[in-house]
């Protein structure tokens, strides 16, 4: 009974739960009513205003082409190169000696011996027996040594000591060590210090260094293994030049010493001096320029004229020192590696010269030889000068200051050349047989 009442009481609750858990029906819900169609009133389209036609642009004229500047007119073809100088004919030593005895100063010591050695040298080198040739060599001998085979040098002992002190300080050698080394007895029986105190000539200094290099280690260190005396004798030629000449040409005296020994002898000094001064062809019209070359290097006067012409043609500043290339340790350096002033100026003129850079480089390497004058670069350069109305000289004194421990005042290559020229004219005046030579020119110097 109680159970029946409980069920009856729960009946309404169960009915409510059943309503909440009704399973989904398979019947679809009724479709929604269609939305009412709203008819809009017709719209009125306002036409856009028609734009006014744009004005027709004026035609742009085509740019007027700027004509390229015309290339410089080509220089005319070069004429054939002049032939090389002919080989000199044989020379009679007797004829040279006769000329020398006419023109050498009358008061020099051993005058006959000087004439004999000049004759032997000229014959060996095929230098003609001409007054102006003999007088040219005589002028250099007089200028460099006043006719002394081993001329004294003023204050040589003082100069040599100062140079040794500089080297000692450079190597950090104590003065006491240096003094001890110089106190040793040298091969001639005197101490090195005694010989140093009494130095008078470059030959004595050269022999002192030779003994120091051989006998004491300190001497070899100070000299760097080489004798620092590089020039000497009556014509002040370099030992290196003498060495080269004795290697390349037969030396006319036998037996012969070493090149260094021969430089300090009368015969060797004038032989090497004659070689340096006269044994190469030139186109100069005055001996003055050979004297300048003797001091500055072969063909320096010709090359200085080229440098001055390049300055005129290009406006570039070029020092007329006679070197068209740069040099290191006496050897030319390629202008492509270290451009010289002349190289830069020539490159600026390439178009007008009609010569390419490779040709210019080849030609500049001939600057210490006569063949440079027959090169395309040289000949085109003077052809261009003629075209511009210039009349440049083919030779000029180089502008070089002279530097040496032996020189105590400002001297130049021009000074040296003019001093030699003065002595040369005095020598020519002593010849009463040959016709006088005008001061403005020389017969094929």
Task: Give the residues covered by each predicted segment.
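Bacterial N-terminal signal peptides that target proteins for export
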Residues: 1-9
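Cell-wall glycan-active module
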Residues: 3-4, 20-445
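Secretory-pathway extracellular proteins and peptide precursors enriched for disulfide-bonded cysteines
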Residues: 11-12, 412
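Bacterial Sec-type N-terminal signal peptides, specifically the leucine/valine-rich hydrophobic h-region
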Residues: 14-17
């Amino acid at each position: 009974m109680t159970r029946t009442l409980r069920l009856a009481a729960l009946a309404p609750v169960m009915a409510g739960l059943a309503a909440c858990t009704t399973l989904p029906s398979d019947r679809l819900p009724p479709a929604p009513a269609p939305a009412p169609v709203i008819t809009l009133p017709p719209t009125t389209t306002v036409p856009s205003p028609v734009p006014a036609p744009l004005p027709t642009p004026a035609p742009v004229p085509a740019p007027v082409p700027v004509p390229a500047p015309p290339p410089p007119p080509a220089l005319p073809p070069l004429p054939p190169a002049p032939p090389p100088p002919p080989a000199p004919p044989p020379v009679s030593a007797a004829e040279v000696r006769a000329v020398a005895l006419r023109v050498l100063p009358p008061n020099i010591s051993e005058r006959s011996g000087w004439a004999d050695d000049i004759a032997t040298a000229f014959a060996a080198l095929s230098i003609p027996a001409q007054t102006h040739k003999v007088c040219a060599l005589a002028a250099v001998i007089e200028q460099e040594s006043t006719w002394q085979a081993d001329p004294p040098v003023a204050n040589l002992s003082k100069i040599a000591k100062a140079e040794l002190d500089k080297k000692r300080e450079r190597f950090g050698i104590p003065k006491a060590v240096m003094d001890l080394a110089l106190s040793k007895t040298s091969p001639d029986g005197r101490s090195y210090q005694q010989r140093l105190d009494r130095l008078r000539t470059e030959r004595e200094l050269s022999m002192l260094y030779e003994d120091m290099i051989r006998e004491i280690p300190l001497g070899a260190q100070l000299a760097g293994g080489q004798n620092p005396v590089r020039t000497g004798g009556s014509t002040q030629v370099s030992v290196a030049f003498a060495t080269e000449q004795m290697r390349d040409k037969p030396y006319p005296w036998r037996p012969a010493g070493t090149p260094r020994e021969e430089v300090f002898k009368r015969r060797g000094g004038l032989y090497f001096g004659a070689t340096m001064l006269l044994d190469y062809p030139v186109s100069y019209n005055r001996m003055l320029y050979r004297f300048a070359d003797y001091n500055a290097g072969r063909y320096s006067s010709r090359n200085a004229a080229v440098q001055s012409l390049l300055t005129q043609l290009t406006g570039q500043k070029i020092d007329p020192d006679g070197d068209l290339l740069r040099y290191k340790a006496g050897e030319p350096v390629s202008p492509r590696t270290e451009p010289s002033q002349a190289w830069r100026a020539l490159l600026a003129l390439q178009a007008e010269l009609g010569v390419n850079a490779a040709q210019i480089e080849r030609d500049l390497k001939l600057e210490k030889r006569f063949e440079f004058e027959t090169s395309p670069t040289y000949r085109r350069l003077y052809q261009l000068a003629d075209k511009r109305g210039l009349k440049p000289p083919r030779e000029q004194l180089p502008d070089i200051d002279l530097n040496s421990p032996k020189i105590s005042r400002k001297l130049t290559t021009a000074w040296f050349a003019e001093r030699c020229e003065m002595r040369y004219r005095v020598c020519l005046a002593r010849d009463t047989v040959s016709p006088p030579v005008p001061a403005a020119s020389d017969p094929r110097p």
